[in-house]
Regions:
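Intrinsic-disorder-associated, low-complexity terminal segments enriched in Asp/Asn/His/Tyr and depleted
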Residues: 5-8
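A structural signal for short hydrophobic beta-strand segments in well-ordered beta-sheet cores
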Residues: 41, 159-161, 214, 226
Length: 347
């Protein structure tokens, strides 16, 4: 719970932390999709996934972010450039993949001496970052983890939280301090605030932020706090989760308080022929083309530079930039390299 005197502070207070988005993973679980685009750039209703986190940080008062890159790092840098979503962007380039822990350590010079707000670039969530930072500051914690309820937190690596909001267990590690009240198991969202003391445990070699920093800090009795995310959350590590994330926001754009752009509807700059049929909800981006005789929707996203030809039927699908949809396309992602079928029930 954030104390009342810390709520609604101006952005200059809220962002007394540097910002980092973790964007260097290999994207292997995305399969063929990850060969075309790295996870930070997969489009969610037409916007690269990483821009959702950047936008949230900008709205919280940040002016700059650090992004680490490895897999397809050149493409990430070319897409975001020196500014993205209202933030100046600096890049921590990894010659070898360093993992979540090594990635943070490698970026320390760019992050500066204070605390760091670190987010996973594949995550899209309804974030209240000022509240998270206020919670961290109120308790002087070594780290503050943004957690959420999940029916099966064990599959993500459960985090145990006591009645006061203190983290008492991470994976199989336990705090030496007994919990106060009941312990609830929750899922870690990949959004966190790290004090310098926690980052000092990391080296710029391949290592894991949880296992190589959080776990030893917890076992040493350091204070790790938990904040709770009550709103929308999605991560896009697999084709199934990727498609589900697109469709969730397409159906209900109001799940996010401040997305990086429009999530549903037809952009005025889209080229939709008079003889095309659109069945809501759809997102037809600027520069997308839907030919006469094509049917798009329900539940379809056509990205900028994508094309749906005459006679095609697209539903429960995303058509990426540079791709052409033909025939009957459903439960799929269409890329310039081909169609990736998605098992929607596996999401």
């Amino acid at each position: 719970m954030v104390p009342s005197h810390l709520r609604h502070r101006p952005p200059t207070f809220a962002m007394q932390a540097s910002v980092m988005l973790l964007a260097a993973g290999r994207s292997t679980r995305l399969g063929a999709l990850g060969l075309t685009l790295p996870k930070p750039l997969v489009p969610i209703c037409g916007h690269p996934a990483i821009t959702f986190g950047l936008r949230a940080a900008a709205q919280a008062g940040a002016s700059r972010a650090v992004v680490n890159v490895f897999h397809r790092g050149d493409l990430v840098r070319a897409t975001l450039g020196a500014r993205a979503s209202g933030l100046a962007v600096d890049y921590a380039v990894e010659a070898d993949l360093l993992g979540t822990g090594g990635g943070v350590a490698n970026a320390r010079a760019l992050l500066g001496p204070g605390p760091a707000l670190v987010m996973n670039a594949k995550v899209v969530a309804d974030l209240d970052l000022p509240a998270l930072l206020a919670e961290h500051a109120a308790h002087g914690a070594t780290a503050t983890m943004l957690l959420r309820d999940d029916p099966d937190p064990q599959r993500w690596g459960a985090i145990g939280v006591d009645a006061t909001g203190r983290v008492v267990s991470i994976l199989d590690a336990r705090s030496p301090h007994p919990p106060e009240g009941a312990v609830t198991l929750r899922m870690f969202t990949g959004v966190q605030v790290l004090a310098p003391a926690l980052m000092d445990r990391l080296q710029p070699i391949f290592c894991d932020l949880i296992r190589d920093a959080y776990v030893p800090a917890l076992r040493d009795g350091e204070t790790i706090r938990a904040a709770t995310l009550g709103g929308y959350f999605a991560e896009h590590s697999t084709p199934e989760r990727y498609l589900a994330g697109n469709l969730a926001l397409l159906r209900d754009p109001g799940l996010l308080r401040d997305p990086p752009g429009t999530l549903a509807g037809v952009d005025p700059e889209a080229r939709v022929a008079a003889g095309a049929r659109l069945i809501a909800p759809v997102r037809i981006a600027a520069g997308a083309e839907v030919e006469s005789g094509a049917e798009v929707g329900p539940d379809a996203v056509v990205d900028a530079g994508a094309r749906v030809v005459a006679g095609a039927r697209v539903r429960r699908a995303v058509v990426w930039s540079g791709a052409t949809a033909t025939g009957d396309v459903s439960d799929a992602v269409v890329t310039a390299s081909g169609v990736v079928m998605v098992n929607a029930e596996a999401a």
